[in-house]
């Protein structure tokens, strides 16, 4: 049993000591079976939220009405959820309510995919009612029960299926793929924000290319912001290894570049995904510089972060790998610039007013820009006296 499970074991045993069932569930169980790094440990029990709160002194109510309590235990936080059955779903996205139950099997039955519907007891024994382990061995994404029924309950599960396909490097089972083809319009009922979270996770997976291909094959791409009518462009993005990029803005910059969104459309396209303004600005700033031929001025205007991001994206596009040696040279070139921002200039707007003895006006910013370029291009030393003499000579021409 993994160390993270062992650390949480006393919590499981405490629930059992009080007469309740308790099991490890969810992604941690799946990842342990796949020998992947285990993340958050989740626990399911037949104890009610109130009974969980009565057993453990430190708890946080994060959704008691849905049966979920955070238990703070030995310096860690664990999500402990009461076995539940979900009542009828509304709007293809959420249940009208939940009913607390006593059966682990019925609780696992409501989950989306077989690989996410396994449990593990305190002895490390796997409880697998729906063939999750079989699907792990066969590397298949398969819903628990009828896929059409699962997708009608929550249409986001179709996109989640592709996301797990990307992250785990699995394939869709034939009946799951068929159900996505038939039910994809239901994704229109899901908020853009939820779709964006899943799609970004999809792009970060090692098999994003195969998942994008599945999105094209099933038509699911048509239900995503700004992608309807762009099947060939979506397929063109398959070749890019997005997982090698760390930052959200860089991933979106690479995506709009690979699907050939032109600069005039790019802002509207990214806004359509309801991304944070900062991510949009950074993505646009990077995307427009991916094919930039760098000189001192363009490096200065880009800034180090964008310079390196744009260069990494170009390297990944052309070589399928980041050329670390080339990036080191680019970083060195940037560090060698005489100035990194306007405030690094040896003169300010006030200095120019003193030099020129003229009323303030647009000429101040124009002169600063001229000085900036001359310094960057090595035509002028970044020294106050040299700049004053240079301005004098310019004004006499």
Curated annotation (Swiss-Prot):
It holds the Pfam family PolyA_pol. It is an enzyme of class 2 (transferase). CTP binds at residues 27, 30, 111, 154, 157, 160, 163. Keywords: ATP-binding, Magnesium, Metal-binding, Nucleotide-binding, Nucleotidyltransferase, RNA repair, RNA-binding, Transferase, tRNA processing. SUPFAM superfamilies: Nucleotidyltransferase, Poly A polymerase C-terminal region-like. GO terms for biological process: RNA repair; tRNA 3'-terminal CCA addition. The keyword Magnesium applies. GO terms for molecular function: ATP binding; CCA tRNA nucleotidyltransferase activity; magnesium ion binding; tRNA binding. ATP binds at residues 27, 30, 111, 154, 157, 160, 163. It catalyses: a tRNA precursor + 2 CTP + ATP = a tRNA with a 3' CCA end + 3 diphosphate; a tRNA with a 3' CCA end + 2 CTP + ATP = a tRNA with a 3' CCACCA end + 3 diphosphate. Its EC number is 2.7.7.72. Its cofactor is Mg(2+). A single active site specifically recognizes both ATP and CTP and is responsible for their addition. Homodimer. Catalyzes the addition and repair of the essential 3'-terminal CCA sequence in tRNAs without using a nucleic acid template. Adds these three nucleotides in the order of C, C, and A to the tRNA nucleotide-73, using CTP and ATP as substrates and producing inorganic pyrophosphate. tRNA 3'-terminal CCA addition is required both for tRNA processing and repair. Also involved in tRNA surveillance by mediating tandem CCA addition to generate a CCACCA at the 3' terminus of unstable tRNAs. While stable tRNAs receive only 3'-terminal CCA, unstable tRNAs are marked with CCACCA and rapidly degraded. This is CCA-adding enzyme.
